[in-house]
């Protein structure tokens, strides 16, 4: 009986270690051509950044998700999920396209930070993160209510 338990324990440990090794080594980040992006991502770039060219594009495959990152010639970084929906846009010193900013967030920023532009916009599971040109970061919940201001 002891021998059988030892064999079962050894088998479980071996399978566990093999699964952990696969999980650890599965991260696959590599450059790709712009044409390999999902159609939605290509359309987003064409619609909102037609005056810019793509500097480089990468795909990051993990066990649970696939993400794409695009860097434009002006330094703007855009992240897309596996279906091509944008997750974040970081323009650093330039303003993000107004068309992608939810109207309630755009209105709040204009009313409270009139001279500032939105330079970073992230969609999060719980809401939105907004980076302003004055260095402030604002967080909004999914109903577009301000929940946090971080400097």
Regions found by a protein language model. Name each.
Residues 1-26, 45:
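Bacterial Sec-dependent N-terminal signal peptides
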Residues 25-151:
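Interaction-mediating elements
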């Amino acid at each position: 009986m002891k021998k059988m338990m030892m064999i079962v324990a050894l088998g479980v440990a071996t399978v566990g270690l093999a699964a952990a090794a696969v999980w650890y080594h599965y991260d696959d980040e590599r450059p790709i051509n712009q044409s390999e992006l999902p159609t939605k991502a290509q359309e987003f770039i064409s619609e909102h950044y037609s005056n810019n060219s793509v500097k480089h594009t990468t795909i990051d495959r993990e066990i649970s998700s696939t993400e794409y990152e695009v860097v434009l010639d002006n330094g703007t970084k855009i992240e897309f999920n596996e279906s091509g929906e944008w997750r974040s846009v970081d323009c650093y010193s330039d303003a993000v396209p107004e068309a992608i900013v939810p109207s309630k967030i755009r209105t709040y920023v204009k009313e409270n930070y009139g001279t500032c532009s939105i330079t970073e916009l992230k969609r999060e599971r719980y809401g939105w993160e907004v980076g302003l040109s004055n260095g402030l970061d604002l967080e909004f919940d999914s109903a577009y209510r301000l929940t946090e201001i971080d400097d």
